[in-house]
């Protein structure tokens, strides 16, 4: 299927250039009901490509509003380098995380209403296309239910014929009903989808993608049942007695993937940090960690993640956006399994002087080294040079207001070429992001070619571990977690509990757009984020008169990042339903607090 690797195909054929002025996107479908569309395989492929492209998967291009306001910037993973944008608000904003995907659902339902009569396809092909469309629809309902709780369940393309519009004004289903629909759909289509794909069909759904969606969705449902509260007569929240069944369903779906033998943790590189880095860059079919991937290439759909996240001295224009916090860096253990706190002071509390500042990160979890650009680490043939200031021989500290400020009659800048400063674009924490970034060249706007693994095998193992530990099967949870730790290159655990499983998920899946949803489904976001002052790691050059700068040492200080603490209001566990959805359908009840 040509160009499905970028999920767009021949969009001009099925552009659906119509606007919604009705209840649940009941737009005209004359074009899509045209027999010429369903008698042309190219047109069907184009339509299918559009459904994939519209599917909400929160990939590298998913951000809030504009200019790289990524989900991680609203969590404990990172802060935003820029001083503008809603990601900086002390009060985490409402409504910006929403996705009311009924136009996308309608497009799928229209496809499903017609595909089984498509003359251009064999009966066997029709079943596969039907299953793919239902997979896309289940993904979209998952995107909505994790945001809003229960939403109206629409499985046919609604058509307004000029009669009573009330027949189209469907109320919200209960939250558990949407999760059950996703589970039932995934189970129904699994046998209809092929076990594997190759060639130009590589990026289309397989039965294991359906298992992975079922696994993730059931994990979320179980979490809501156990840790959330039921309100609005079940429109939000899930009865607690349903939790065990959902944990078991998540575990069973994971087992189907694990026991298939078709997937494995990526181990192509000998160096553990390099291996973790290239896990996200190796697009070959030999990368068996990929279960379902969305592809990007500059010929059809280039990415912007590199452009917005390049360190200061490596950027083209925008850059620097995602700054991992020192708190988050400390979450990565050392290779021997010891606590990950950075060793900036000796046992007496005095600053340690480092001749090589990268030694501060010696023996850290290789996943940290593969995910985060830290002070003075190598990058794109140079180094990421981060310095907050200079300590004079008399012990006083000099800091800069700009990157060009020089130290007392020398040519040495007070801050290094990549920061840190309290203003401008440079890092506010001492760190930049490395995961997903192109290591060998600077990438311009919409020229990124890093693919997005919607589902990868390590997530399945972590889902499995979480379900097992919640069901009391710590032996299996420990086994799954230690497979991941072994690949990472850190010491195995000898026992496991719920918090340790969550910790493993936090560091393994960092910056992959899981953390925001995880802390919401566990209902701990307010505990983690409210009044939390995130920290920065600031390197200082210890000045010695008469020495070359390259011979001087560094100390590090863990200091407050120049960002306000945040507040996560309890109502944010569910999103505000868009006002236009309610104004056109009085049967839709708004979520509490809005």
Question: What would you call each of these model-derived segments?
Answer:
Residues 1-18:
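Sec-dependent bacterial lipoprotein signal peptides
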Residues 19-20, 101-104, 181, 272-336, ...:
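Long, intrinsically disordered, low-complexity segments
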Residues 20-63, 358-360, 582-594:
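Membrane-proximal, proline-rich intrinsically disordered regions
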Residues 40-59, 77-148, 166-202, 356-357, ...:
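Conserved, well-structured interaction surfaces
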Residues 61-77, 154-159, 193-212, 225-323, ...:
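Short, surface-exposed recognition loops and adjoining beta-strand edges that mediate ligand/DNA contacts
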Residues 145-146, 152, 217-229, 472-473:
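Short coil/turn linking the two alpha-helices of tandem helical-hairpin repeats
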């Amino acid at each position: 299927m040509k160009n499905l690797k970028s999920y767009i195909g021949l969009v001009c054929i099925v552009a659906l250039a119509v606007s919604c002025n009705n209840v649940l996107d009941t737009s005209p479908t004359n074009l899509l009901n045209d027999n010429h569309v369903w008698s042309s395989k190219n047109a069907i492929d184009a339509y299918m490509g559009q459904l994939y492209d519209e599917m909400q998967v929160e990939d590298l291009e998913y951000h809030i509003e504009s200019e790289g306001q990524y989900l991680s910037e609203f969590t404990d993973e990172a802060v935003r380098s820029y001083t503008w944008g809603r990601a900086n608000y002390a009060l985490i904003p409402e409504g910006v995380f929403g996705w009311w995907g009924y136009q996308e659902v309608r497009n799928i339902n229209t496809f499903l209403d017609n595909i089984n009569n498509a003359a251009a396809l064999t009966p066997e092909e029709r079943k596969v296309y039907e299953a793919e469309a239902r997979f896309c629809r289940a993904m979209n309902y998952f995107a909505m239910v994790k945001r809003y709780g229960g939403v109206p369940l629409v499985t046919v393309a609604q058509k307004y014929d000029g009669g009573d519009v009330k027949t189209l004004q469907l109320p919200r289903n209960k939250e558990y009903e949407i999760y059950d629909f996703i589970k039932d759909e995934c189970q129904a289509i699994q046998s209809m989808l092929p076990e594997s794909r190759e060639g130009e069909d590589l990026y289309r759904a397989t039965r294991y993608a359906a298992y992975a969606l079922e696994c993730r969705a059931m994990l979320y449902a179980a979490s809501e049942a156990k840790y959330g509260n039921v309100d609005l007569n079940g429109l939000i929240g899930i009865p607690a007695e349903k939790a065990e069944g959902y944990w078991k369903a998540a575990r069973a779906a994971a087992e189907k993937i694990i026991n298939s033998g078709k997937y494995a943790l990526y181990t192509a590189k000998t160096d553990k940090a390099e291996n973790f880095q290239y896990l996200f860059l190796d697009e070959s079919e030999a990368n068996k960690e990929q279960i379902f991937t969305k592809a990007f290439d500059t010929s059809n759909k280039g990415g912007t993640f590199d452009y917005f996240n390049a360190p200061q001295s490596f950027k083209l224009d925008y850059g620097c956006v995602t700054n991992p916090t020192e708190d988050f860096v400390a979450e990565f253990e050392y290779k021997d399994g010891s606590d990950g706190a950075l060793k900036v002071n000796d046992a007496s509390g005095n600053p340690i002087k480092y001749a090589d500042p990268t030694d501060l990160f010696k023996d850290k979890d290789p996943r940290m080294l593969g995910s985060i650009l830290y002070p003075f680490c190598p990058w794109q043939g140079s180094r990421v040079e981060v310095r907050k200031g200079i300590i004079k021989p008399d012990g006083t500290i000099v800091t800069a207001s700009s990157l060009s400020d020089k130290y007392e009659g020398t040519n040495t800048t007070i801050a290094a070429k990549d920061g840190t400063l309290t203003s401008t674009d440079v890092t506010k924490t001492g760190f930049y992001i490395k995961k997903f970034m192109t290591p060998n060249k600077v990438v311009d706007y919409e020229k990124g070619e890093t693919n997005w693994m919607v589902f990868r095998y390590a997530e399945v193992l972590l889902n499995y571990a979480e379900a097992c530990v919640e069901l009391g099967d710590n032996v299996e949870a420990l086994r799954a977690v230690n497979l991941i730790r072994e690949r990472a290159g850190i010491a195995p655990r000898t026992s496991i509990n719920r918090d340790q499983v969550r910790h493993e998920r936090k560091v393994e899946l960092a910056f992959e757009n899981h953390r925001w949803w995880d802390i919401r489904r566990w209902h701990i976001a307010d505990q983690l984020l409210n009044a939390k002052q995130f920290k920065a790691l600031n390197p200082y050059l210890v000045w010695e008169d008469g020495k070359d700068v390259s011979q001087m040492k560094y100390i590090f200080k863990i200091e407050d990042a120049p960002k306000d603490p945040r507040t996560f209001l309890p109502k944010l566990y569910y999103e505000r339903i868009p006002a236009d959805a309610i104004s056109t359908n009085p049967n839709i009840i708004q979520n509490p607090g809005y």
